[in-house]
């Protein structure tokens, strides 16, 4: 019997979704993004004059500094999108993103039986006690699909 591995689902390819995908890349997560691009709220800014209200050095991934980190300017939304795109390309996380895939429902089904797990110890860290099973309904441009995923927000210190 082939090993059964949990699939990690991440909702949204904004700042947090990209960071989670990078941290969980060794588990091949599936990122559901409702739109056709990354960036979350920064992609859909209503005003071209929108800027971050923090300095760029305070709004950066710890392992991917801004190229002009010491600038005292407040980045525009286009600069933030460029930064997020550079981050996603640098860490090769776009391959995990399923664009135009809106999560419309999530249901908890309970625990799988321990006999369902045949992976080696250490293949996957315990996220929750037991072996939870979730069903995620995703609406795409083509059809509705179901993915079984395990939540990721229970990892400390992502």
Name the predicted role of every residue range.
Residues 72-153:
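Feature captures the FAD/FMN-dependent oxidoreductase FAD-binding
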Residues 30-32, 59, 98, 153:
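Hydrophobic/aromatic beta-strand patches that form the interior of the parallel beta-sheet core
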Residues 4-7, 25-27, 38, 57, ...:
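Core residues of folded domains in eukaryotic genome-function proteins
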Residues 3-31:
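N-terminal Rossmann-like FAD-binding beta1-loop-alpha1 element of flavoenzymes
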Residues 155-158:
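Flavin (primarily FAD) binding-site architecture
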Residues 35-87, 110:
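Glycine-rich active-site loop/strand segments that organize a redox cofactor
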Residues 1, 16, 37, 50, ...:
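Surface-exposed, flexible loop/turn segments at secondary-structure boundaries
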């Amino acid at each position: 019997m082939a090993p059964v591995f949990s699939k990690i689902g991440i909702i949204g390819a904004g700042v947090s979704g990209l960071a989670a995908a990078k941290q969980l890349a060794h588990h091949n997560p599936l990122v559901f993004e409702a739109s056709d691009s990354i960036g979350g709220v920064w992609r859909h800014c209503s005003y071209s004059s929108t800027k971050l209200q923090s300095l760029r050095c305070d709004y950066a991934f710890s392992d991917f500094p801004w190229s002009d980190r010491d600038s005292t300017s407040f980045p525009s939304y286009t600069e933030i999108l460029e930064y997020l795109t550079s981050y996603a390309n640098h860490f090769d996380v776009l391959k995990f993103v399923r664009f135009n895939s809106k999560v419309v429902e999530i249901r908890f089904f309970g625990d799988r039986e321990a006999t369902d797990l045949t992976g080696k110890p250490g293949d996957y860290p315990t996220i929750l006690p037991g072996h939870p099973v979730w069903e995620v309904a995703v609406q795409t441009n083509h059809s509705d699909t179901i993915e079984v995923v395990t939540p990721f927000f229970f990892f400390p210190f992502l």
